[in-house]
Design a protein with these regions (language model features):
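Conserved polar/disulfide-associated segments of primarily extracytoplasmic proteins
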Residues: 60-171, 176
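Short, surface-exposed beta-strand/loop micro-motifs that present aromatic residues
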Residues: 175-186
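C-terminal motif of bacterial Sec signal peptides marking the signal peptidase cleavage site
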Residues: 14-15
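Start-of-domain marker
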Residues: 22-68
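Sec-dependent signal peptide recognition
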Residues: 2-10
Length: 224
């Protein structure tokens, strides 16, 4: 696609802590965010390609409000990277910041406010609070009106929203996207990490959360 955060899991929390202590992953790739160097994780089946000229051109509008620290395409899409922007795609990650807070020393108390601001910017409806089922939400979803399906914390210092959104493609066809919008506190800095997939029923949400949570954990482990 061209244009285009439940309950705390003790198992994941322990996993973040223990894995971070093992230091299994080297910081082979990193990007500066203000005065802080952020290590970029490797994600299975994906290529990090933020510096590719086509990615730079494709993400120009995102970079007007903040730096793009990481951009991950799956292997299949990466094979067509030279024509990025001429076809629709999904299954990609974005790690980005905000110029207004890149040198702000944040604490854990800033995370809920950050998530609240993100939720307000979506101008969506929190269906989790209303007790609606996902398929019920999907059947009543309107273009340009995102629905927040779930909120949870996959790891310490991370708040995640699962967002369902319908939009109209340039050819007039309607598409539905499910995304994980992560608010992250790492090295006293606030970052966003988003993962997008085409929605294909409830199973898509489980897969999205599995992949998203794994990538977020790797990011936190590398930046302990």
């Amino acid at each position: 696609m061209k244009k285009i955060i439940g309950a705390l899991s003790l198992v994941l929390l322990i996993g973040c802590s223990l894995s971070g202590n093992r230091k299994n992953d080297a910081c082979n790739h990193s990007e500066w965010y203000g005065y802080v160097n952020i290590c970029l994780p490797t994600i299975d089946g994906m290529k990090e390609c933020r510096l590719h000229p086509r990615v730079q051109a494709f993400t120009q509008k995102y970079r007007e409000s903040g730096p793009l620290l990481g951009y991950y395409l799956n292997d299949k899409t990466y094979q067509r990277i030279d024509s990025l922007g001429t076809f629709s795609f999904d299954n990609y990650f974005m790690l980005y910041g905000d110029y207004n807070r890149e040198n702000y020393e944040a604490t854990a108390t800033d995370l809920p406010l950050m998530q609240q601001q993100l939720e307000q910017s979506l101008v969506g409806t929190n269906w989790q609070e209303r007790g609606r089922q996902v398929e019920d939400v999907y059947n009543t979803l309107m273009i340009g009106q995102p629905a927040i399906i779930e909120k949870y914390s996959p790891c310490s210092d991370v708040l995640t929203m699962i967002v369902l959104m319908k939009y109209r493609q340039e050819n007039g066809q309607e598409s539905t996207v499910i995304s994980a919008a992560n608010c992250i506190l790492v090295k006293k800095r606030l970052l966003n990490m988003a993962y997008y997939m085409a929605y294909d029923g409830g199973k898509t949400i489980d897969l999205l959360k599995e992949r998203n949570d794994g990538a977020v954990q790797k990011l936190m482990q590398l930046n302990q």
